[in-house]
Amino acid sequence: MVMSLTHLATLRALDRLGTMVSVAQVLGYTPGAVSQQIAALETAVGERLVARAGRNVVLTDAGRVLAVHADRILTAEQDALEALRSVNDELSAPFALGVFGSTAAALLPAVMAAAQRRYPRLELTSRELSVDVVVDAVRRGSVDAAIGLDYPIAPMPRGGDTEIITLRRESFGLAMSRDFGETVDADAVHLQELADWTFIIPPAHTPFGAAVRAACRQSGFEPNVRHEIMDSAVTLALVARGLGAAFVTDTMIALNPAAPLTRVRIVDDFSREIVLVRPVASVARRTVRAVTAIVQDVVDDDLEGAIASP
């Protein structure tokens, strides 16, 4: 029996995800089928690749060594397929792009249109992701690349296997109801002046919620959170009704331009970055480079245009 690419892909997934159940969920198998594939691979190489650890399994030393080579082999296979598809200088490969809620509305239509114009045979699909699982989704191979949000004060996980490309950096300001805005005698405030304000922000376990709390704590206070809301449109609607203030960016406002709000600039450096996350090894793939360029152009042109529009 010889090693198959399917067996190697299963071993690589087990090395990355850690459990048979997780591998089964990502690859679309049953846990029993995953176990059978690992057993078949052990027979092929004549070595034990996994060992029991309670209810779970861990890779043996031989398993870890083979997992490293499996990743190289599978990457080489992808590169070979990419090269074959590029023989006629035309992209005709599948590509899954991860997006989060607001990018799906603001960027995805323009990205799809640009891809269709430049590469008619590129099979570009999208998958909505929560912003807190973007890096994991790319690492697991659930998507080929993903648009996400990174907060310098509470950065997303980094690793040697992923690359984070900054597409746009934008500063946070404050949004409040027009009635409350009339009581604020300034067009800019320091964070430390907001200790007595009430806020509408996402929960602490979200990247945005963690970043807001970190910025406030860095300025010496714990934010008074009246409402924990994850949806930007809902947040702005509540702000307009006077239920609290919210931290907003130009992009967030551009997606909800009808909300009757007053905005105040924050003097302190509190910002976020719209980023593209992709596997480091995938840079050699022409599709990855092409989609990266498309997303960068759309962010520069279409998103900038939406923000600049009245």
Predicted regions and their residues:
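Secondary-structure junction motif
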Residues: 149, 176, 182-185, 189, ...
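Hydrophobic hinge/microswitch elements
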Residues: 130-143, 149, 205-262
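Short helix-boundary/capping micro-motifs
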Residues: 12-29
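Beta-alpha-beta core module
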Residues: 156-166, 170, 233-283
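Acidic, Gly/Pro-rich loop/turn segments at junctions of secondary structure
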Residues: 118, 129-196, 252-257
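Central regulatory/effector-binding core of bacterial HTH transcription factors
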Residues: 92-155, 229
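Conserved amphipathic alpha-helical core elements
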Residues: 41-42, 115
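A short LG(V/I)-centered, amphipathic sequence patch enriched
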Residues: 20, 42-64
